Amino acid sequence: LYLDDAVDIVEEMPASVVIRILDKATPELRKSINEILKYPEDSAGSIMTVEYLSLKKDMTVSDAFKRIRRIGGELETINILYVTDPTRHLLGVLSVRDLLLAEEDDLIEDIMDPNVIWARTLDDKEDVAQALSKYDFLAMPIVDMEQRLVGIVTVDDAMDVIEEETTEDFEKMAAMLPSDKPYLKTGVFETWKARTPWLMILMLSATFTGIILTHFEDALMSCAILTSFVP
């Protein structure tokens, strides 16, 4: 279970259960979960994972492969690698493909791309998801206010955000209260409960419109064009 998925599960649990889980967790895991939970729900920080693979610019390609073999199996993705300095400032990005095509004694700084597209922890998560889709990225690096790398948003989490926002827009168009579940996974009763408030509002507005129209019936009959302005 990857960290971002663990955070999603923790967010759905009662506070008493969360406390017990965090008590049982290792100090490192507890720190990572708390780090993500502190971000606003609609921010990039709330959907990022802190499990990424970073390299130093003075490493060789051979050193990079050794690091990937050592810790890569514990991470959510190793397709994209990030180059940082000793204080975690983001310097560049490269892919495993770049490593495979390079010589073993090539330096990372010579093959990395220094032009990194990144997002901040407090950026809107929908904007980050749209950027991932626009640039066809597998992951987006997330930095803090001092441009230190703190995590990444992976493409699967971005797709979850896009699905969530699309569902919410669809429900608004259908006169439904936004739901946490995708439309096709929502039960009949939940759908009915979500639509009822909006249907009541529409019914009341239609009733008031009807009452008003009865007072101006003669005017409408004499000038039919006025019906075009009826809401």
Task: Please place each PLM-identified region on the residue numbering.
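Cytosolic regulatory modules rich in charged/polar residues
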Residues: 1-231
